[in-house]
Amino acid sequence: MSFRMNRRRFMQSTSSALAVGALSSVAGRASAQLPGELRVMVGGGDWGKANIEAYVKPFEAETGIKVQTITDDILLAQMELMAQTKNATVDVVVIGIGDIGAAVRKELVEKIDYSIYKKDELDGISAAFKHHYAIASSVYSFNMVYNTKAYPPNKPRPTSWSEFWDTEKFPGLRVMRSGDSGEGPWEEALLADGVPADKLYPLDIDRVFASLDKIKPHVRKWWAAGSEIQQILHDGAADLAHSFDGRAQLLIDQGAPVEINRNQAKLTFDYWVISKGSPNAENAQKFLEFATRAKNQAKFSQLFSLGPSNLNAFKLIPDDIARKLASHPDYKANSIPRNAQWYSEVGTDGLTNQQRFAERWKEWSL
């Protein structure tokens, strides 16, 4: 999500030397690890505070394990350096679903020990959120969002991506997510072109861009950062938008004339992972199990508007808050989980599918 991913992507676009320097900074602040300790990337700002309140403090109280929180973003380049030098200075890291494939291929992460999870907790976590080497920390989505001044509830408005693409029936200024990172409106373009939701993968890259050709003249801006789409929605500079649900929800909570359409939402999520060679791997496994319990995720989601990966958490979240979250059970039937495995697959050209989309976007957007 924008709170983390935009900053991460910016940093990944800089030199590897910067990444190494950042890791050295983390390591320099860290003393030698001891039994009963753990270093966890929690992130900064309100997200980091929510991670500390919902997970870190109660974990310390329950286990007696002392957690050192890391507010810096930890990049794949840093994780690779830790693995190469056999010096894992951060035990638990949050990464995006687009990074898990590379992390596994490069042997940067440990396997998750699901044997320590209680059955009822595991049953609450859908298969899409469980990976051999990672487990989803939180869930968010890309949605169609209305400017209710242009499209009030009593006026016909698009409810599917095919209707969003229908600019004659539903005129107005549109804004959509840029594909510069390889994470663009690919699934939405195929849905607009008539591909059934359960037949999206493998994505047909030529068909995606043929569909985008049709909507391109009607898109006022292709936004890259969450702050951009939030400002656009705040200013009323678009009638229809392709947006993070969380950015739109923040404005709704502030009384802005914005409404989220949950139909055909694209679900995506971040992963908790354990750094390869972590000297505190056992404690890290305990932390991940703790951080995916329904009770603790329910607390987190009430502090920060990200959906829980353990759907049992919704039994503990007040309904008015629960319905603001992308992973709410009522939205499941009409949502499309992003296929992390497919995006991370490497082709004969040595590129992942995500990288291939990023390259194609650069050519197409010129």
Language-model segments: what does each one mean?
Residues 1-21:
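N-terminal secretory signal peptides and thylakoid transit peptides that target proteins
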Residues 34-101:
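Early extracytoplasmic/lumenal segment of secretory-pathway proteins
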Residues 45-52, 88-90, 94-220, 224-234:
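Extracytoplasmic ligand-binding site segments that recognize negatively charged/polar headgroups
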Residues 100-102, 234, 240-257:
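A ligand-binding cleft/hinge motif common to bilobed small-molecule-binding domains
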Residues 103-111, 128-131, 250-262, 326:
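Ligand-binding "clamshell"
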Residues 140, 206-215, 252-278, 322:
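Periplasmic-binding protein-like
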Residues 275-338:
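Mature extracytoplasmic/periplasmic domains
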Residues 334-366:
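Conserved C-terminal helix/tail region of periplasmic/extracytoplasmic solute-binding proteins
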